[in-house]
Amino acid sequence: MDKEWLEVCIYTSSEALEAISGILYNTGVKGVSIEDPKDIEFKRKHPGDWDYFDETLLKVKDTAIVKGYYKEDDKFNEYLDYIKKSVSNLDQFGIDKGEGLVEVHKVNEEDWENNWKKYYKPTKVSNKIVIKPIWENYDKKQEEIIVELDPGMAFGTGTHETTRMCINALEKYIKEDRTVFDIGCGSGILSIAAAKLGAKHVIGVDLDPVAVKSSKENIKYNNLDNIEILEGNLMEVVEGRANIVVANIIADVIIFLTEGVKAFIEKGGYFIASGIINSRKEDVIKKLEETGFIIEEVREEGEWACIVSKIN
C-alpha cells in the first residue's frame, strides 16, 4: 500500500459535519475523520465524565474540521472539484457551512490512520452509559454501563449532542422485554446502548455496508447476542413492530420516513428522532403530528433537537 496520501481538509461548522462527510463518501475517499470542537467543549464542561483527556486538545479552535484521505490518482482533481462545489452549495440547503475552506496536504499513512484516535476518550453520555473506545482503559463505577466502541474513521465518537440525546431518551423509555429498531445504525452505538439498557431484542438497519460491518464488529466487542444488524431500508428488510424506533439521521430523512415508520411501532410505542437542527424542529413536529404521533417531549442541546413522540 502507498505510504503517502492526499488529505483534504474542510473547515466548517459543527452543523455541517454530517453533510460534508456525506459529500466525501460520494467520492473515492479511503477514510474520513471528524474534529468537532463541540465534543471538546463537552469534555471541558464535564470534567468528571471522562477518565483522561489530553490537555492539548482543549486548545482546539472553534472551527470544525472534516478530513478525507485519498490516493493521488487521475480522478483526484475531479473529486476535489466536486467537493469544493458541494461545500459551496450547502447554504442553499439551509446548512451553515462555516468557513467552507477546502485545503489539500500530503500526509503519511501512519499519521492519518491513528491521529484521529487522540480525540476519543471514555466519556459518560448519560446517567448510566459510558462510551469507551476499545483501545482505552477505564475504571467502571458500580452504576455505570460500558459501551465498548471502535467507531473507525467513518463514524463520529458517540459524544455528539444528537447521540447523547438519543441515549438519554433510550435510558428513560426502555423497559424490560421491549423491542427496539435503530434506523441508520452507523457504528451500532444506539443499538448496543439499547440492548445494554435492557431491551429484549434490537434490530439495527443501515443502507451503508461499511456501517453494517462496523455495527456487527462493535456488537462482538460488547458480547451481545440479542442484536440483529441488517443492510437495507427499514421498510424492506424488517418485519414486525417495535416498542421503540430510534433514528439519529437528519430532519429531511425523518420527515420522509415518518409515515412508513408508524406502521412499525406498537400501540403505545415511541419514536425517538434526532439529528434535527433546531431550525427544522417545527417542520418535523408538524409532520409527526399530521401523521398521528403525539409529541411526548422535545430535548435540545446546542444547535440540535431530539423529538420523542408516541403512538396511542
From Swiss-Prot:
It catalyses: L-lysyl-[protein] + 3 S-adenosyl-L-methionine = N(6),N(6),N(6)-trimethyl-L-lysyl-[protein] + 3 S-adenosyl-L-homocysteine + 3 H(+). Pfam families: PrmA (PF06325). GO terms for molecular function: protein methyltransferase activity; protein-lysine N-methyltransferase activity. Keywords: Cytoplasm, Methyltransferase, S-adenosyl-L-methionine, Transferase. One of its GO terms (biological process) is methylation. It comes from the Bacteria. InterPro entries: Ribosomal_L11_MeTrfase_PrmA, Ribosomal_PrmA_MeTrfase, SAM-dependent_MTases_sf. Belongs to the methyltransferase superfamily. PrmA family. Methylates ribosomal protein L11. This is Ribosomal protein L11 methyltransferase. It comes from Clostridium botulinum (strain Hall / ATCC 3502 / NCTC 13319 / Type A). The gene is prmA.
